[in-house]
């Protein structure tokens, strides 16, 4: 087995055996379950009125009880929830050895640092995409059980593209989370970075600059602020790509040259 294959296998085993990815998946599952509850409330206005604030929240979040509204809710949940839960997974993957003080043992293995970092990024990408696909599948099941109207194969196909596209725009930006978790040698600095980018993304979107701020693009793509054609341009996607590449390159550079004996 090559050094890269060994690193990938080790990272995969760590992910499978840890409860962190499972808890992230459970947390992500709350989105379609809550969406199904909102649809159920909106389908029964008499019962909804007796629920007071819950009914009001459902109207604000979803609006109407149909598949388009349900899919929109899921897409926006992937943008908001993904920014947090994908970051938690990334922080754990890159920060665990520093918090456990086992990074020196990791680097003592006959495997290049580049192979280790690549393996970590691959595990993050595969797991976060798997989480997204799971949420879409769970959403289909929940929506079918609630029996909401407006279903069509074309709508489901469009929703799948929107949800997957939102995730694909979010996942590469985790490269900066990986960098901060590595340079900060633990979890807390990366958590701080995640909160900072969420706050700045909301401010940028409100100020009308979201299309120029990489961390605001996934939320705008999800339709949280209106039709994406009115919010985003080609430059928005280019900025996400460039920012992600900068974070990726900086992470590789840091792992290659940093003194890991401290």
Give the label of every model feature segment.
Residues 28-86, 118-183, 223, 227-242:
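Secretory targeting signals
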Residues 30-44, 184-221:
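Transmembrane helix segments
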Residues 1-29, 182:
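Aromatic- and glycine-rich beta-strand/loop motifs that create alpha-glucan
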Residues 86-90, 103, 138, 176-177, ...:
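Hydrophobic/aromatic residues in alpha-helical transmembrane segments
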Residues 14, 242-262:
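Junction motif at the cytosolic side of a transmembrane helix
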